[in-house]
């Protein structure tokens, strides 16, 4: 959702100020995110990654509060509404959006299901950067302005790096459990020590890229001042990632997610100056 907010701000700054498709883009992003989350919970439950001994937050499936049948119905409902909202966006973006919309919904499933689930084969970070950063920002911007440029792709990549912070926290917390269930993540390959450094540098790189994709909107000094809160906050969260262990890391999930919102709001504020 933060990605789309950021894209809308950039599009409005460049003349793409149409609120109806902007709101529909937000709705589509929320539905796609919800679909991905529910499918991921279902997949982790089926594989055994989520169980009564898991370090992560309590899951309704594991506790028995929600049945498999209910989850499947929820997935069907979410996908159906998501598809309809996506179809409505074709009015503004053209039929070229259809294959990409279907791809987004497909990735929501392939992220944790299928013969080669992305999150189980060290491709989770790549998927997050692409489909929670580059794709939503690029196509929201395209729908509103009818153009794509390198600046907006850089903006999408930067947001993808920030959104990836949440996945890194998850994978650091579940490093031992993931190995037990043959779930291969970047933490499993490179080690938590290395990925904690990536966690620190992701938002720094994202803010650095801002000097490029915001150059037509503000001067370097304005952007340098604007990103100070983001930089301070991300360093604080990074320190906590190195300090917290086990279930303590659950407290960082919301804090890591907040980085994306802060980054998006930073862009929004600068565009309003």
Predicted segment positions?
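Small-residue-rich segments of transmembrane alpha-helices in multi-pass membrane proteins
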Residues: 1-7, 126-141, 188-192, 253-267
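Membrane-embedded alpha-helical segments that form the functional core of polytopic membrane enzymes
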Residues: 6, 10, 15-39, 98-106, ...
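Acidic (Asp/Glu-rich) catalytic motifs at the cytosolic membrane interface
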Residues: 28-55, 165-187
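Multi-pass membrane catalytic core of lipid/isoprenoid biosynthesis enzymes
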Residues: 52-95, 183-218, 257-258, 263
């Amino acid at each position: 959702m933060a990605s789309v907010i950021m894209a809308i701000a950039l599009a409005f700054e460049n003349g793409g100020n149409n609120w109806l498709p902007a709101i529909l883009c937000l709705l589509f992003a929320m539905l796609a995110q919800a679909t991905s989350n529910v499918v991921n919970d279902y997949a982790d439950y089926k594989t055994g990654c989520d169980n009564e001994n898991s370090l992560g937050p309590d899951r309704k499936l594991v506790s028995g509060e929600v049945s498999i049948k209910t989850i499947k119905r929820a997935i069907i409902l979410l996908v159906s509404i998501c598809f309809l909202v996506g179809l409505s966006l074709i009015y503004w973006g053209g039929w070229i959006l259809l294959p990409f919309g279907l791809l987004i919904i497909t990735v929501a499933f392939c992220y944790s299901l299928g013969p080669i689930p992305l999150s189980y084969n060290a491709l989770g970070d790549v998927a997050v950067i692409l489909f929670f950063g580059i794709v939503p920002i690029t196509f929201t911007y395209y729908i509103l302005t009818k153009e794509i440029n390198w600046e907006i792709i850089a903006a999408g990549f930067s947001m993808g790096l920030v959104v990836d912070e949440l996945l890194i926290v998850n994978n650091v917390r579940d490093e031992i459990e993931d190995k037990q269930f043959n779930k291969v993540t970047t933490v499993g390959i490179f080690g938590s020590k290395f990925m904690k450094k990536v966690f620190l540098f992701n938002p720094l790189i994202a803010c650095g890229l801002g000097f490029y994709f915001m150059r037509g909107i503000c001067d370097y000094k304005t952007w340098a001042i604007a990103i100070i809160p983001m930089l301070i906050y991300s360093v604080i969260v990074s320190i906590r990632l190195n300090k917290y262990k086990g279930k303590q890391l659950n407290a960082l999930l919301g804090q890591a997610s907040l980085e994306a919102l802060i980054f998006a709001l930073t862009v929004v504020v600068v565009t309003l100056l």
